[in-house]
Amino acid sequence: MDLLLNCLNLNTIAIASILSLIFLCLFLYRKNSRGKDAPVVSGAWPILGHLSLLNGSQTPHKVLGALADKYGPLFTIKLGMKPALVLSNWEMSKELFTTNDLAVSSRPKLVAVEVMSYNQAFVGLAPYGPYWRELRKIVTFEFLSNRRIEQRNHIRVSEVRTSIKELFDIWSNGNKNESRYTLVDIKQWLAYLTFNMVVRMVVGKRYFGVMHVEGKDKAQRFMKNIREFMNLMGTFTVADGVPCLRWLDLGGHEKAMKANAKEVDKLLSEWLEEHRQKKLLGENVESDRDFMDVMISALNGAQIGAFDADTICKATSLELILGGTDSTAVTLTWALSLLLRNPLALGKAKEEIDMQIGKDEYIRESDISKLVYLQAIVKETLRLYPPAPFSSPREFTENCILGGYHIKKGTRLIHNLWKIHRDPSVWSDPLEFKPERFLTTHKDVDLRGHNFELLPFGSGRRVCAGMSLGLNMVHFTLANLLHSFDILNPSAEPVDMTEFFGFTNTKATPLEILVKPRQSPNYYETL
């Protein structure tokens, strides 16, 4: 009997030991497969987290770039009570967009996004799902496809040439120095040009210049609203990190957002009613139809998801105007600033245009493919000064592993493009303006989201759909300006490159330059 009990005890101990070993192996396997948590930046405040880090005098992308040097390419900060993963490395970007793209294809519902984008009706800020897929398909086909871009070629050509003619008139009537140069605010000129170009394509109106068809006061007010819109859209409110404090509206940001959104919606509603009346009166000519005309017909009063046709039409039109005007003008301003600081590169660009186009000849959009150095200038500008130093906000919708770290569902993503674009392990002399790198060591690097060391338009499912149109406008405008005018820095000091962080990364100060015609008077008179 004792022998039997001893045998049973030994069997029990053996089974228990085996089970314990199995459970230990399973625990270790799950722990290893789960991955460890990414490093967390120290110094978080109770409730507010690391918000104080992002509200200092230095721009947020530079602050987080410096933290990446300390904590590595993946680390976590707390935006109030919300965890956010900061990604600052091209290898991690590649892993993210090739392995976990679906998990990070949605957008967080921030206060600015809710209040100012018609509650996430913007296709670029909508959560990933059926509404986003359906609307992106319509917008791409009706406005951003190569066929539609080519159909609206005459608008872009007309606006650029008209603006060049107006700049020539400013020179003709302005005060000239001993070298016959005239001082102009080129940053403002670019803002008006890109605004006219995009607004004509979207709603068929021209607001600025000698050929404007709307009241100047109305135009200036709308431009002011747009600038405020972009600044407010880039504002991270305390309520975004601590939702329970939203009712306090600390800083008054939400109040300002609502006031701005109301003003902008008022004009959009006017445009929509004008287009609807034009359709009822049969005044729509197929060749003259703008994007709002097309959207009214395409939607035909139908609802998509939770949004009615009017809301979709207004939201999408506004989004195209915002995205097309601000990022284009910002990129052109940085490009000219860099060229004025680098006269050798400016000289090479003009030499290429002279050789490929010729004196007193007009540039066509089809000529841009021959201007390879000019394209390299634009790439280098987008590397050093991407219009959005952080890609648009994303949120993980499921748990995943990235770089060996466990990322929890609900974590927000801050993708620091500015830091990635200045990685010394990828780019030699990363802080220097060297367009030649895109003709030699990086000649195969494109901007379409497949080369993860250069992602000014993002990557994956949420890559910027307006990339082709935006590049088209930047290349064509820059080529025409450099072909038509000699430009100089009016100061003995280098051009100020101070940045102002908002929804886009703008130049904080005006860009005043000296201009003088490069072509004969007849060239400008027949534009």
From Swiss-Prot:
GO terms for molecular function: heme binding; iron ion binding; monooxygenase activity; oxidoreductase activity, acting on paired donors, with incorporation or reduction of molecular oxygen. Signal peptide: none annotated. Its EC number is 1.14.-.-. It is found in: Membrane. InterPro entries: Cyt_P450 (IPR001128), Cyt_P450_CS (IPR017972), Cyt_P450_E_grp-I (IPR002401), Cyt_P450_sf (IPR036396), Plant_Cytochrome_P450_Monoox (IPR050651). Induction: By fungal elicitor. Heme binds at residue 464. Keywords: Heme, Iron, Membrane, Metal-binding, Monooxygenase, Oxidoreductase. Its cofactor is heme. It comes from the Eukaryota. One of its GO terms (cellular component) is membrane. Belongs to the cytochrome P450 family. This is Cytochrome P450 82A3. It comes from Glycine max (Soybean).
